[in-house]
Structures are given as C-alpha cells and as structure tokens.
C-alpha cells in the first residue's frame, strides 16, 4: 500500500543517523559494530510504519532488528515509532529488498520477516513478489545455513504462491497457519495493516520456512 508523501521525511531521516543508517554499504560485515554487540540480527523487508519491528525490538532486547523499506515517507513514520520507543536494538534502512547483498555479508543475518508484502497479482509482475525465486537467491546469501524466513499475509493468492515458491526452491516448511488469529500461536506481534485486517475479521496466513 502506498502512503501519502510526507513533508520533511528526508530531513527527518537525515537528522537521526543513530537509528537510520544512511550509508549501509559501509556497515556490510560490521553490523555488530553498528549495534555495539554480537547479538543475533533479524531483518524485516518491507517494514511499513514500524509497528512490528519496534514491537519485536522491545519484546526481545537480546536480538538486534533492522527494518527495511524503500518508501521514504513510510520509513519516516517507522522512525517516529522507533524514537518513541527508545529501543536501542533497532535500526532502519531505506534500500530495496533485491539489493540486500550490498549491505550484508554472507550469513550476517540470522532471521528475516516478510509481513504483508505487496502481492503483485498480475502474472507479468511475478518477479516483483518478495517470495519469487530471485529474491530467495538473495535471502539465502545473507542468511546462515538453515536460516529462517517468517512470512505473514492476508492475501491467499500470495500465500499459496509463496508456499509453492519456497517448496520448489527446496526450502523446508516448518509450520503453516491458515488462520493465525484463530490458532493457539503465542507471541504474535502485529503490523499496522494486520491490526486493521483483524478488526475486519480477515484471515491472516503465516508460515515459517528454512533453507
């Protein structure tokens, strides 16, 4: 979903270099230095307005989190949440999900999250889906052996596509939820969109897969 352009968004990011890594190429291979510790690093590709990444950071202080989004205004709203939370273990990047190997070394990321990604329903846009094989190639390079992807969506078509994509890639589907909010799954942290969908009674799909 697109967000209306936010005035001053660029300046907002530039004025907060502690949380927003403005030159992420320079951090490649040295993210432990950026965070000041050697804790595991989890990333969310398509972090939206930051509810999930901030919530996870507060819930798990022993894990470092990086929220990634290419949309300037969206990332500025995520920064608002990070600043309000004062979570020391979260950083933000404005980069494209297809270029992650420019910013992370092999195996430097321990886990990644894909939450409510754009489904790109038209066949001609298949390669833009974040669970397309080309993206999986990228994710595999920055995750360790048996690295995990946790995926959530309200879009059944994208969920079915992703199940097939992960399986055809040779990944292992650890767990699958066909109605997350009706399940006994504990510890779910919702995104802004997820909270909105939940109020409408929409089904949320979730899976965990490993390389």
UniProtKB/Swiss-Prot annotation:
| Covalent S-S links between cysteines | none
Q: Which transformation does this protein catalyse, written as a reaction?
A: guanosine(46) in tRNA + S-adenosyl-L-methionine = N(7)-methylguanosine(46) in tRNA + S-adenosyl-L-homocysteine
State the InterPro entries in the record.
SAM-dependent_MTases_sf, tRNA_(Gua-N-7)_MeTrfase_Trmb, tRNA_methyltr_TrmB_bact
List residues binding substrate.
122, 154, 191-194
CDD domains per UniProt: AdoMet_MTases
Q: Supply the Pfam families for this chain.
A: Methyltransf_4
Q: What positions constitute the catalytic site?
A: 118
Molecular function terms from GO: tRNA (guanine(46)-N7)-methyltransferase activity
Superkingdom = Bacteria
May I have one GO cellular component term? Answer: tRNA methyltransferase complex
- Top-level EC class as recorded in UniProt: transferase
Protein name as annotated: tRNA (guanine-N(7)-)-methyltransferase
Q: Identify the species of origin.
A: Streptococcus equi subsp. zooepidemicus (strain H70)
